[in-house]
């Protein structure tokens, strides 16, 4: 009787292993920003290929602002959700079209949200392509010189207020 109850358990364990082993044998364990080579500490990361970023030239300025506001709020990590949504609330409505394009590239081209966070906090240097006026603005904002509490993304009520 014990052998009969053991067989389904053994079958489940073997089926889980047999499902994962082909994936693990062909998966590349790398993650890096385009153009950078992985360091030893990054060799255990799984690389997920993303389509290359393309500038949207057929988009109106208001549509771009709305999209960037959404993309600033919906990130892959909480730290950037908070940081970028507060930054967008403060600066997005006053940005020129050129600055909006630079911000679009900054938040959408890197394949890893941690890169953006490290560049904004100056923990790592940003690639030359991202060294621009918007990155400087983001770095200054990240320093939080006014010592504001930044514990969560802003509520959306400010979208319905009259512009300052």
UniProtKB/Swiss-Prot annotation:
Its main location: mitochondrion. The keyword Membrane does not apply. It comes from the Eukaryota. It holds the Pfam family Sdh5. Keywords: Chaperone, Mitochondrion, Transit peptide. It is found in: Mitochondrion matrix. SUPFAM superfamilies: YgfY-like (SSF109910). GO terms for biological process: canonical Wnt signaling pathway; epithelial to mesenchymal transition; mitochondrial electron transport, succinate to ubiquinone; mitochondrial respiratory chain complex II assembly; negative regulation of canonical Wnt signaling pathway; negative regulation of epithelial to mesenchymal transition; protein-FAD linkage; tricarboxylic acid cycle. GO terms for cellular component: mitochondrial matrix; mitochondrion. Residues 1-27 form a transit peptide. Belongs to the SDHAF2 family. HAMAP family: SDHAF2. Plays an essential role in the assembly of succinate dehydrogenase (SDH), an enzyme complex (also referred to as respiratory complex II) that is a component of both the tricarboxylic acid (TCA) cycle and the mitochondrial electron transport chain, and which couples the oxidation of succinate to fumarate with the reduction of ubiquinone (coenzyme Q) to ubiquinol. Required for flavinylation (covalent attachment of FAD) of the flavoprotein subunit SDHA of the SDH catalytic dimer. Interacts with SDHA within the SDH catalytic dimer. This is Succinate dehydrogenase assembly factor 2, mitochondrial.
């Amino acid at each position: 009787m014990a052998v009969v109850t053991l067989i389904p358990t053994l079958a489940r364990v073997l089926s889980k292993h047999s499902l994962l082993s082909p994936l693990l044998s062909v998966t590349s364990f790398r993650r890096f920003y385009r153009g950078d080579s992985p360091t030893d500490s990054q060799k255990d990361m799984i690389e997920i290929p993303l389509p290359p970023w393309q500038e949207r030239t057929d988009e109106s300025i208001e549509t771009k602002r709305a999209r960037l506001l959404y993309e600033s709020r919906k990130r892959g990590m909480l730290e950037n959700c908070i940081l970028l949504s507060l930054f967008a609330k403060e600066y997005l409505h006053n940005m020129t079209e050129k600055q909006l394009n630079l911000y679009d590239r900054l938040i959408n081209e890197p394949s890893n949200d941690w890169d953006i966070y490290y560049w904004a906090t100056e923990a790592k240097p940003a690639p030359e392509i991202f060294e621009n006026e918007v990155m400087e603005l983001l770095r200054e904002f990240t320093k939080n010189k006014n010592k504001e509490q930044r514990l969560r993304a802003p509520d959306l009520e400010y979208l319905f207020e009259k512009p300052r």
